[in-house]
Amino acid sequence: MPEKPYDHIAIELKWHERWQDAQFYKAEENSAKPKFYVLEMLPYPSGTLHIGHIRNYSIGDALARYKWMRGFNVLHPMGWDAFGLPAENAAIANKVPPRQWTLQNIAAMKKTHRRFAFSYDWDREVSTCEPEYYRWNQWFFLRMLERGLAYRKRALVNWCPKCATVLANEQVVDGCCWRHEGTPVEQRALDQWFLKITDYADQLLDEMARLEGGWPERVLTMQRNWIGRSEGAEIDFTLAGAGTPIRVFTTRVDTIYGATSVILAPEHPLNETLLDSEKKAKAKAMVDSRAGRDPGDIDKEGFFTGHYAVNPYNGEQVPIWIANFVLMGYGTGAIMAVPAHDERDFEFCTKYGIPITPVIRPVDQPAGEPVALPYGEYGILENSGEWSGLASAEARRQMSAYAEQHGFGKSAITFRIKDWGISRQRYWGTPIPVIHCPSCGVVPVPDDQLPVVLPDRIEITGAGRSPLENVPEFVNVACPKCGEPARRETDTMDTFVDSSWYFYRYCDPHNSERPFDPAKIAYWFEIDQYIGGIEHAILHLIYSRFFTKVMRDIGLISNNEPARRLFTQGMVIAEGAKMSKSKGNVVGADLLADKFGADTARMFVLSNVPPEKEVDWREEGAEGTYRFLGRVYRFTTRNVPAQQRSGDADRKVVRKLHQTLKKITEDFETRWHFNTCIASIMELVNLLYAEEQNISAAVMPQILESLALMLAPFAPYLSQEMWEEIGKEGPVFRQAWPAFDPELAKEEGAEIVVQVNGKVRTRITAPFGTAKEELESRSLAHEKVKPFIDGKQVMKIITVPDKLVNIVVK
């Protein structure tokens, strides 16, 4: 048959239309097949897909298609993380309701998803902005409220005076509002709802052992640091002259004789009595100046309160300071500064002239010799009363016990992680299902009144508190307990609540009686492969682990973790630079599909580097991928039906075919180096072109069939077209994955590298186990070697059997 040109537009349109209503990607319930749940993190519906999205989804799709071909029952769903601030901003800018803007974006993105033939089971689609979904956010909140895991307290929040509203931490840039550059963000105290994630801090940390080997070590390290478990002691200094205790937390009680000051957080409750009005204003300015910033990134500043504290171990008085780097949310909000043995304290105390007293020396350093400061390691105590001469570890144990015996301290564990503040003064989020009654206080909305639905008619201006406060029919309700007039909560939930459990809903997306059927979760969970960016390591991936443990304790599920394996894909950059709208270098998915086709885009983002590495989008690279797909298609079409040819190359191409199958199979099962999978297919195609006239009619059909099957995970449109061209029926990715034969994949002989003075000059093939003398003789006589040794003295020959001959001459 004459070869056909590769018309990606015609091929992809043809199969796109045929697949529209097909149910190829439906997961089966209660199947006897082994299950495989593969999931890419659900996207925010921004309206358009770019090449970065395509890479993420192509990784998951390749794996899903491969697992189908290996006989698995595959669950591969997709949904939308649809609540969030961008929709409110669009409503303000364009006078479009957030719901309308969101649904338009979902429709546009879903159309592109379908265009790229990602194998999603769309019957399981969820959108977190639908009442059918966020009803269960509210249900989970009420269960946590019952268990004491949800509570309300007054807390400091970021406040922009120009916006007249609360900002999330991510909306604070260098201490200023993201909308109003140069406008410092203030800290205000507001009543906020929290989820008690700290109750699960130990579990979140300890149960990471189950994830080792399945999750990237970098993610686990980030989570360990974020949870930040510290073992130490809480010690009560006392306010000189008053006896009021000032409890400090320290991990190094062995250094307490070197404490030369006590430092309080600027919002510490004791400041109300310690500070005059001028110093209170100073402390408040400190709080405002660090709003939304990492304390480690700010210049350390402080001031003396004018008061002193008494060290309970030696009775000495030390000054009490206020400093911006001490956090109320960590430990007790008060620290003892030991500048001789802590780098941060050393920097601060040196700046303000606070004394420095060494009390620890290195184990291998004689007593009396000066210590290079700050010395932060363990060592031997000195100048520490009765504990002088003890090693740090033993001193910590004895000194903690002494504090407990004498009633001024105890051993303690503290965590860096704080309870999760979920209140947002926004419209486009899940309403928090409580009612505030003057008589009954905080009253949960009864389950049979869920969902509390967002009102459709609302004006969003971006000013003031929650827009919901301006909707009387939403706010004004009867108390469920006493029936008297009451007010509905107007805060909405952090959108991370939505994404903390969505993967469970995929297993039972249409259940109107409960979040999901536990039996379905028992079948599908844990997620076998979760895929998403490293940027989610310490928010979504911690919150989802927390939700899983709470659901386990409620009795809904039995698994301890949401995902068995996690993969974090690399970023896509464009022409060497990070893609951004401001640079104008965002590569849109639809434009790529128009120019090169969906298959080319999918293949390119997988073909250059391993998927965990950054990939650089370059148009010439996409053109190369497009040419390769064209070569494959033309080779297929001109060899159907197979021609009667010599068959001289049959053994060679069959061997290469089975080597390629072996390579791809092993990569899918282990390291996911899709780039080397695709490279091996390219090598096979190069050989097929070179030996085309020497492949028999008996072997060619096997080659073409295997080629279509190997391409199926990477290029679904082209592989399906090839499958039809060779006379096969049914979806190609539902065929059995071709098995490789280890015997057929074996080389008939070894390839020997021949070098002269360490430089490769040629390669020869010889039967395995060929004697070194014969290898050397053949190498010396080779036409490509002789020009480099003629007229020269052979000093020695280094031979590695089956691998190398290196001729050393001078």
Curated annotation (Swiss-Prot):
Native species: Solibacter usitatus (strain Ellin6076)
Segments carrying motif 'KMSKS' region: 578-582
Tree of life domain: Bacteria
Family: Belongs to the class-I aminoacyl-tRNA synthetase family.
This enzyme's EC code(s): 6.1.1.4
Entry keyword set: Aminoacyl-tRNA synthetase, ATP-binding, Cytoplasm, Ligase, Nucleotide-binding, Protein biosynthesis
Gene3D superfamilies assigned: 3.10.20.590, HUPs (3.40.50.620), Isoleucyl-tRNA Synthetase, Domain 1 (1.10.730.10)
Any GO BP: leucyl-tRNA aminoacylation
Name assigned to this protein: Leucine--tRNA ligase
Short sequence motif named 'HIGH' region, residue ranges: 43-53
CDD domains assigned: Anticodon_Ia_Leu_BEm, LeuRS_core
Subcellular location: Cytoplasm
A molecular-function term among this protein's GO annotations: aminoacyl-tRNA deacylase activity
Main location: cytoplasm
